[in-house]
């Protein structure tokens, strides 16, 4: 679905600018996303591909009149996509200052900088999101799953990518504890993305 070179790496080194095409309207047209050369995560990894597929697969289930959250935004690719598919308000959360700087360059290059606002971890925000997408690995999502779900609106969509397939049972149990539905699981090689609905 995503036209790009895929590397099975966590650390990226984009030696040149990338033009990424995301098919829409049953592949009749595409959204173009431009990512500058750099090292922030989020363009050349299988999990980014899975996250984009998950977003596009659920595009008809999303309330675009509310706000979305890109949690662990890296290069900004998912924030850019969210802006281009219809969100006028996107919160981008990234703790790495260098990644934020690269992301801002990418937001401006894609002309969506006015739609995206950088936020710290939304512990102090009263915002409820119709869509939260997170393409990060490690234990962070497991430890904070309940809190992140609490930031979803009713019928809100939560997309997690960056997961090894071995984590499926753990996140299935977390979904049961939080009483949210698993809509789908997308798999590519050893990686997976899970799609939840509150």
Model-predicted segments: where are they?
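Ser/Thr- (and often Asn-) enriched beta-sheet segments in non-cytosolic proteins
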Residues: 19-21, 32-34, 117, 181-184
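S-adenosylmethionine
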Residues: 53, 95-194
